[in-house]
Amino acid sequence: MSQILFKTKTFWYGIALTFCIATLSYFLAKLPFLMILGQLVTAILIGIIIRALFPVPEKWFTGIQFSNKVILRAGIILLGFRLNLVDIYHAGWRVFLIAALCLSFGITIVYFLAKLFGVDKKLAILVACGTGICGAAAVVAISPQVKADNNQTAVAATIIALLGTIFTVIYTLIYPILPLGPDGYGIFAGATLHEIAHVIAAADPGGSSAVDMAVIVKLTRVALLVPVCFVVAKMVNAGTKNRFSWAELPVPWFIFGFLATSAINSFGIIPTSVTDFLVICAYFLIAMSMGGLGLNVHLPSFGKMGGKPFAAALIGSVFLSAFGLALVLLFHLAG
């Protein structure tokens, strides 16, 4: 099946579209009024604008989804070549505690608000987990655990994609006035934003140290996807005849690739000139996935899905941002 997919022209058209968006965003981000947003956020916005103004053929989305998932993970793995694991050791337990607390708070507050607004239980769980863990990837992973249908999954993923984009733009704009240094800002972004791509894009204005911290905190949340899936499945199946299957638990294997490249860089095995080039490639691949993320935001669909789940996720995300900022300041990690 995958061999047939790779041979289709429409698949490559989707890849080519995200490639063009990444290239365009690279040059546009050099303009004064877009420089504050950076290449990655610019790529998301270009994708949203293209989807809103032009009819993107449905068959192209096989390639676009490939950019969203596979190319994004490849970019994250390559991004490890600029990370030094010694820095992670120095970050200490407080960083990982913040990640776990924000995950728990995000899921709880969004689910509570969604139920308060009368949102269907399955959709409420999907939106809550998407907000608290790792965006659309969490939505897709949790969906079979709660037996959600395709429409519920699509609605939740779209809500998270749009909200994550909105908050990414807001973060980049307010960064200069936040009481946070690069590392603190990276922890804040990694602990509170939705998708991995959103985290990298938002942290980028803070520089390399901000991005490194943001990725580590975010990957900590991603790693917690498996135990969260386990808990959700147990809760949903409680009192039913449905049996839990370990085989259905999603394992984010790309995290190990990221740690491997980080270890290689930490030991200085590869020359700096080579790792610098690989990091440039990583950013371009991530920009391609950003473009794909923007292309998946279908604005008219929000009129059909109703505002309740969106409102719950929006308000919950605001609370999550405030909670994450408070934790960073409380643990004296603002610098």
Curated annotation (Swiss-Prot):
It is found in: Cell membrane. Pfam families: Cons_hypoth698. It is a multi-pass membrane protein. InterPro entries: Na+/solute_symporter_sf, UPF0324_pro. Its main location: membrane. The keyword Transmembrane helix applies. Coiled coil: none annotated. The chain crosses the membrane at residues 10-28, 33-55, 91-113, 123-142, 155-177, 251-270, 277-299, 309-331. GO terms for cellular component: plasma membrane. Keywords: Cell membrane, Membrane, Transmembrane, Transmembrane helix. Belongs to the UPF0324 family. This is UPF0324 membrane protein LMOf2365_2179. It comes from Listeria monocytogenes serotype 4b (strain F2365).
